[in-house]
């Protein structure tokens, strides 16, 4: 009837609440996994479910072995990479193989070595759990134990100063209370590498096998960075520099590997000791980062010296340099300050006082062309034109007067012409006088690009004053005229402005002014003579003077405070601007507007080219004609006049010379003929005929020769080359008969002239004694001697083309102007000259016959000679002398017969007896062509007129009888 308590119900509820709390607690733990507890939803519990999480937290032995391999190779690979880049390690080979073993861990292939086996034994036997590796320290250092007593290891700082390393380390050790061992005192540590494995955070995870591939990939990046960066450090550069050269053994880098716990690095450290004084850092540190792994974080760090410039020097030399203070600082002379320069007042002729430091260079002291611009100070990249323009604008915009004490160095700079060193202009005093320029001529003959001036002005010249305007004519200096070579090498340039008066010329000489300047404007030629002025001195090329050029540093020449004018620079700058504007305005000049204009231009160019080619072809003939005319004009003068007017030609009368010499003006040698290439009729007195009589009849074979023929004629053996147009000795012809119409009138010959001329003989003519009695003296001597008349008939026939008397009278001559004009022509007699067989005369002709008589036998003949034209050479010397006498005397008559008189012959010289031949060839002492009223032209004379002579033979004239008539028909002048 009353209720009973229910005990089972609360018990069941308590049991379910306990299960729900246990489920919630397991789900919050990281080891709980829903996939392994799917069967718990039914409330079924087993004992195996509670032991499963403890078994899955332990990794397998295979995964632990892989972790240990990574830790071991992590240390050994780092040591191999570091030491391979610092020292030479011997490779290790496999058994029975010559191929070295290669370490391919972390995708960096390096040769294995057994040299590090003992030193790396600690890190080869370590593991990640029980025997963890200590930090590995690798040091590279220099060992000074190998130095001798007179050798010292020195370190060079950034300024190149030498420091004794041993003394520096000893000084650093004495400043600290703790001292290192003596064995470490001689070591200079370059680098210190630290490879370390950090502490492991906890137990190894159960899924260690899945994490290891990711750790390996991260390590590849680390070791590749280590391999690359190890070759960027200063120690590697020092090793490579010594490896290329045979360095001292003390400079070879050594290494050591030790554990990080072996010593306390807080004590004395040689790596951080400074070796020399300075503000730079002694050491620097670089870290390659941290690579996470299940065994702990991997890290690599390097501490290195920033300066690794070492060398071995002699101890005594280093000590003496320290005593002398040569390495303390670079010697710098004391320089005046800017205020001192402003207070200094220049004096006339004083030494240069303005000096500029390198920090404040004078921009006008630049040299070079427009394309190569060199500064005194640091390079600013400014071209010379822009620098000059900036200087001009600065002067124009400067409000301060020119007499201000403080001047801007750039505004006060007066730039000289491009290519020359300039001087600092002085505007404070307009009346400051300039010192005379002192030019240097280092070369005898300057090359094409030589800049020194060819003319040196006198050192005693008065200084020129430079004012605001141009230099007046009265203040200009004068200089002596240069030589002929200088004037020919540097032609004068003319300008529109200032003309300077010269003491050697009456007319003023213009100063050189150019339309516009270029890169070679500093090489403009200077006038050959006359004075110079300031503008000319400024424009002169390469005048190394104290006023117009500023010396470069170290040359010994200092710049001087002068009033150099810059008008020439401004004018050049303005001319360049105007020229560029003109090119912009007249662009049609470069590009023709139409095709017609282009065709016209091409036709004009073609015509001009054709004309130029034609005139070039005429150049040689015109030059030869000019030389022939000059030779004909100059050969009739005396030796004194000829030697003065011809440069390099000795005055030797009777020598066949011409002015057709080389352009260089070298002297004409008497060994080589210098005759005109073109026949000239300017002077008949300088042409003679030494040939035999032309034969045009029945008596024998004629020897016909034209005056215009070439020299390639048949001749007998002779050592002298035939010359087409030779000239004859001046003493053969009398001075009283000269043609008034001749272009070159022969001057009167005197005995003293003849003696001087014929005694001037070439050395090559031999050692025979010359005759002191000349032909002219013998000719005048026979005028005073009794002359015997020896009449002989002339077998050569009549010498007229009009049928007149065919015999020619060679009458006696008497002294006086009218001696030849009064000669009788009516009788068939010939006067024999008493000097024709004179021994002196024979020897003179013999000399000319044998050795070329100052030009050969052709010097006595204009057309042909007795040797070259078939003349018979007598076998006996006496007969040969007689023939030469006859040839020398009859040359003049033969010449005049060719020029205007008809001449015939009944027989040649070969057909005559020797006695008659000698008498026939007696010389005529008068010029037949001088009696003619006029001359026939060259064309009419070449046609020739023929007429019968008195002996019945047909005589021919080379150039016709003309208006002169025959010999018997001459009208004698009173």
UniProtKB/Swiss-Prot annotation:
Which residues fall in a compositionally biased region of kind Basic and acidic residues?
19-28
Q: Which GO terms describe its biological process?
A: mitophagy; piecemeal microautophagy of the nucleus; protein localization to phagophore assembly site; protein transport
Gene designation per UniProt: atg13
**The keyword Cytoplasm is assigned to this record:** yes
Naming one, the record's GO cellular component terms include: Atg1/ULK1 kinase complex
- Give the compositionally biased regions (Basic residues): 838-850
Q: Which UniProt keywords apply?
A: Autophagy, Cytoplasm, Protein transport, Transport
Give the GO molecular function terms: protein kinase regulator activity
Question: Where is there biased composition of kind Low complexity?
Answer: 1-18, 403-422, 498-508, 541-551, 856-871, 950-974
Question: Which family is it part of?
Answer: Belongs to the ATG13 family. Fungi subfamily.
Summary of subunit composition and partner proteins: Interacts with atg1 to form the atg1-atg13 kinase complex.
Functional summary from the UniProt entry? Activates the atg1 kinase in a nutritional condition dependent manner through the TOR pathway, leading to autophagy. Also involved in cytoplasm to vacuole transport (Cvt) and more specifically in Cvt vesicle formation. Seems to play a role in the switching machinery regulating the conversion between the Cvt pathway and autophagy. Finally, atg13 is also required for glycogen storage during stationary phase.
- Which cell locations does it reside in? Cytoplasm; Preautophagosomal structure
Task: Write out the ranges of the annotated region (Disordered).
Answer: 1-63, 389-561, 642-749, 790-871, 883-974
Protein name, please? Autophagy-related protein 13
Its taxonomic placement starts with:
Eukaryota, Fungi, Dikarya, Ascomycota, Pezizomycotina
Q: Which domain of life is it from?
A: Eukaryota
- Show the disulfide pairing: none
Biased region (Polar residues) positions are 462-474, 681-694, 826-835
């Amino acid at each position: 009837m009353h209720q009973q308590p229910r005990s089972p119900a609360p018990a069941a509820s308590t049991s379910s609440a306990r299960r729900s709390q246990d489920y919630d607690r397991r789900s919050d733990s990281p080891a709980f996994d829903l996939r392994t507890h799917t069967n718990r939803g039914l409330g079924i519990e087993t004992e195996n479910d509670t032991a499963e999480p403890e078994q899955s937290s332990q990794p397998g032995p295979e995964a632990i072995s892989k972790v240990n391999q990574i830790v071991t190779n992590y240390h050994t690979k780092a040591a191999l990479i570091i030491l391979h880049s610092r020292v030479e390690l011997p490779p290790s080979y496999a058994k029975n193989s010559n191929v070295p073993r290669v370490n391919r861990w972390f995708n960096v292939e390096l040769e294995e070595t057994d040299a590090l086996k003992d030193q790396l034994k600690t890190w080869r036997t370590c593991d990640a759990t029980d025997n963890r590796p200590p930090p590995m320290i690798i040091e590279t250092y220099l060992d000074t134990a190998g130095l001798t007593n007179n050798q010292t290891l020195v370190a060079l700082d950034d300024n190149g100063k030498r420091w004794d390393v041993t003394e520096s380390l000893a000084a650093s050790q004495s400043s600290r209370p703790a001292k290192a061992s003596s064995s470490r005192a001689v070591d200079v540590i370059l680098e210190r590498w630290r490879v370390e494995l950090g502490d492991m955070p906890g137990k190894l995870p159960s899924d260690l096998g899945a994490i290891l591939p990711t750790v390996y990939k991260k390590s590849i990046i680390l070791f590749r960075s280590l391999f690359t960066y190890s070759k960027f450090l200063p120690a590697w550069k020092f090793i490579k520099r010594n490896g290329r050269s045979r360095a001292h053994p003390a400079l070879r880098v050594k290494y050591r590997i030790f554990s990080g716990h072996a010593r306390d690095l807080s004590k004395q450290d040689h790596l951080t000791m400074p070796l020399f004084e300075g503000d730079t850092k002694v050491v620097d540190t670089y870290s390659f980062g941290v690579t996470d792994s299940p065994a702990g974080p991997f890290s690599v760090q390097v501490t290195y010296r920033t300066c690794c410039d070492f060398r071995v020097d002699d101890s005594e030399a280093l000590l003496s340099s320290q005593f002398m203070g040569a390495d303390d600082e670079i010697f710098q002379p004391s320089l005046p300050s800017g205020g001192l320069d402003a207070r200094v007042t220049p004096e006339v002729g004083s030494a240069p006082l303005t000096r500029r430091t390198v920090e404040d260079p004078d921009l006008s002291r630049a040299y070079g062309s427009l394309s190569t611009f060199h500064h005194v100070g640091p390079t600013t990249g400014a071209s010379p034109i822009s620098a000059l323009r900036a200087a001009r604008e600065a002067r124009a915009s400067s409000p301060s007067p020119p007499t201000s004490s403080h001047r801007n160095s750039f505004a006060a700079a007066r730039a000289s012409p491009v290519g020359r060193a300039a001087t600092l202009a002085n505007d404070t005093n307009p009346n400051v006088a300039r010192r005379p320029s002192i030019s240097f001529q280092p070369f005898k003959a300057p090359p094409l690009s030589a800049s020194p001036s060819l003319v040196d002005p006198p050192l005693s010249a008065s200084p020129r004053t430079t004012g605001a305007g141009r230099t007046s004519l009265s203040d200009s200096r004068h200089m002596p005229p240069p030589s002929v070579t200088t004037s020919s090498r540097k032609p004068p340039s003319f300008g529109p402005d200032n003309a300077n008066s010269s003491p050697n010329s009456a007319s003023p000489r213009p100063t050189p002014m150019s339309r516009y300047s270029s890169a070679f404007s500093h090489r403009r030629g200077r006038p050959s003579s006359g004075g110079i002025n300031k503008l000319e001195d400024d424009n002169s090329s390469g005048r190394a003077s104290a006023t117009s050029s500023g010396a470069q540093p170290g040359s010994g020449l200092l710049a001087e405070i002068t009033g150099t004018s810059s008008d020439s620079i401004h004018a050049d700058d303005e001319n360049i601007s105007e020229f560029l504007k003109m090119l912009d305005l007249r662009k049609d000049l470069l590009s023709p507007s139409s095709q017609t204009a282009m065709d016209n231009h091409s036709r004009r160019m073609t015509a001009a080219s054709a004309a130029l080619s034609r005139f070039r072809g005429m150049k040689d003939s015109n030059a030869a004609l000019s030389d022939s005319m000059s030779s004909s004009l100059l050969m009739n003068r005396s030796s004194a006049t000829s030697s003065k007017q011809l440069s390099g030609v000795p005055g030797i009368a009777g020598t066949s010379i011409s002015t057709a010499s080389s352009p260089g003006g070298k002297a004409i040698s008497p060994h080589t003929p210098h005759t005109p290439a073109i026949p000239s009729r300017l002077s008949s007195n300088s042409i003679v005929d030494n040939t035999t009589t032309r034969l045009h009849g029945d008596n024998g074979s004629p020897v016909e020769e034209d005056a215009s023929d070439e020299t390639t004629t048949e001749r007998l053996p002779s050592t002298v080359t035939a010359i087409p147009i030779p000239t004859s000795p001046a003493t053969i012809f009398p001075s009283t008969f000269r043609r008034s119409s001749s272009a070159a009138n022969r001057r009167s010959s005197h005995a003293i002239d003849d003696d001087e001329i014929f005694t001037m003989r070439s050395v090559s003519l031999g050692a025979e004694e010359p005759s002191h009695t000349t032909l002219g003296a013998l000719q005048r001597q026979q005028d005073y001697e009794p002359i015997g008349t020896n009449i002989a008939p002339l077998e050569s026939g009549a010498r007229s083309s009009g049928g007149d008397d065919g015999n020619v009278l060679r009458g006696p001559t008497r002294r006086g102007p009218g001696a030849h004009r009064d000669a009788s022509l009516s009788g068939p007699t010939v006067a024999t000259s008493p000097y024709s067989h004179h021994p002196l005369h024979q020897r003179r002709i013999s000399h000319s016959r044998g050795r070329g008589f100052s030009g050969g036998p052709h010097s006595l003949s204009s057309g042909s000679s007795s040797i070259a034209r078939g003349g018979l050479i007598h076998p006996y010397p006496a007969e040969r002398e007689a023939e030469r006498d006859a040839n020398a005397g009859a040359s003049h008559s033969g010449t005049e017969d060719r020029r205007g008189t008809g001449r015939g012959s009944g027989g040649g010289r070969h057909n005559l007896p020797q006695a008659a031949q000698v008498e026939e060839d007696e010389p005529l002492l008068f010029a037949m062509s001088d009696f003619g009223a006029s001359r026939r032209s060259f064309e009419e004379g070449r046609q020739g007129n023929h007429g019968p002579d008195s002996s019945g033979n047909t005589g021919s004239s080379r150039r016709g009888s003309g208006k002169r008539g025959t010999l018997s028909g001459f009208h004698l002048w009173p």
